[in-house]
Structure formats: C-alpha cells, structure tokens
Amino acid sequence: MAADDGIRILPLAGIPEIRIAADLGALIGDAIERTDGALPLSDLDVLVVTQKVVSKAEGAVIDLTGIVPGQEALEFAQRYDRDARQVQVVLNEARRIVRMENGVIITETPHGFVCANGGVDASNVGPDSGSLVTLLPRDSDASAAAIRRAVRARFEVDIPVIVSDSFGRPWRWGIVDVAIGVSGIMPLEDLRGSPDADGRVMRSTVRAVADEFASAAELALGKAAGRPVALVRGAAFTRGDGSIRDVIIPGVNDLFR
C-alpha cells in the first residue's frame, strides 16, 4: 500500500532518556500524541524505532566494570588502543568471528547479522552511562511486535514496526541504518518475474523494503539529535508476518563466507 501525496517522515519529539525496564511502548504512544501532524495514525504509517532505546528498555546492557578480558581481547586491545573489556564483550556476543584486523572486529551475531563489533556499542547509552555498553536485542522481531501491540492497543490502528540499527557496508565508507527487527511488514519485495519499465523480465531484483524504511527514517532522526523514533508515512509496503530472518542469506547461498 502507498499514498498518492508523497512520503513524509515525522520524528517523534519528547521521548525521554530511556532507562532499563522503561515502558517503551507507552513512551512512544505519548510522543505520537504530542507530534503535530502525526494524528490520526494511518494504515499507511510505519513506525521506525532505533535499536539503542529498545536495547536499553529491555536491559540489553552490560557494565564493563564486571568484565574480565581474556588474553585474545587484551592483545587486540593493546595493539589497537581499544578497551579490552569491550573487546571481550564483542567476542562473548559473537557466534563467529569473521575478521579481527586493523582495529576492527567483524562478527556474525546469533541473529545472523554480520557487522562491526557484533552490535556492541558505547555511544548514546546515556549521559550518566559511565562504563555501560549496549547489546543488540535478543529477539528484535519480538521487540518490534511488542511495540506494535502497545500502539495498536492505545490507538486502535495496526501499524507495522521496524527496529533499526546502523551497519557499515563492505567496500564503501560510511554507515546506513538497516532493519534488524520487523513486525507487521514483509521486509523484502520480490520482483523477480515481473516486467521492468521496458517490459523486460526482472531476474534478480529483490527490494530490501524494511532497510529502505530504516534508512529513510534516519534522514530525519540523525545520530546525535536525541530522536530515536519516526513515523514514515505514505511509502509503499506489503503487510504480513515477515521476519528479519527473511533477509539473512543462508550460508549455502552466501558468496562471501
């Protein structure tokens, strides 16, 4: 579904610093009510929520003061001027180490994501965070579903929810926001077998729709503006019981493993 009058991205203002065990769904609901132009909610809306606030609300946070680094972490940290405790957390959270080189650790997470530092991050944890780092949510689809249920119960509108995070990309500098959890939306649009604008049959085109929503929302949210949630209104998507697992390429099909 899509609107005829273009796409709008509406950052939700007034969401406070998220604490562990905060009712994130209720806080997002409060912000929706305060946001001019965002109401009434529409079935053309998609809610994008950044990973950091989800992780904090769910308690996916580790205090580095309790971490004892092993020899591998100590050697890597000394060589590249890293915090050995944080390196150890990255190693602990990894299903598989892809590369450890030039101060960068690329891991495969238990979710199947391949990313720098396994999603372990000390940025935007909070002004009094001290030695805290956040982890990725254990089940980002479930996180998205919980927020979706809270919004639906409050506003009686069922809008899809995407949890987003910043990932780097091979062979390109810079990061972009991608989806790491979805609820109520199909994360991919398979166009294979459909004709293109010239009538040619597309053979390999599969759009990463959820990633596109995540990146679009980031244009309005920014990295340091303290705005972790946005409504994306009017963009085309397909409703359904999609999972972020749908976007993970199986090992047998992955040319880079």
Where are these regions (language model features)?
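A structural signal for small-residue-enriched, beta-sheet-centric alpha/beta enzyme cores
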Residues: A2-P16, Q51, V61-I67, E72-L135, ...
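Phosphate-interacting basic helix/loop segments used at nucleotide- and nucleic-acid interfaces
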Residues: A22-L39, R138-I159
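Short, conserved active-site loops that position catalytic residues or coordinate cofactors/metal ions
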Residues: L44, V49-K52, A57
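Conserved SET/PR domain catalytic loop and adjacent active-site segment
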Residues: L27-I28, K56-A57, R169-P170
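N-terminal glycine-/serine-/threonine-rich phosphate-binding loop
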Residues: M1-V46
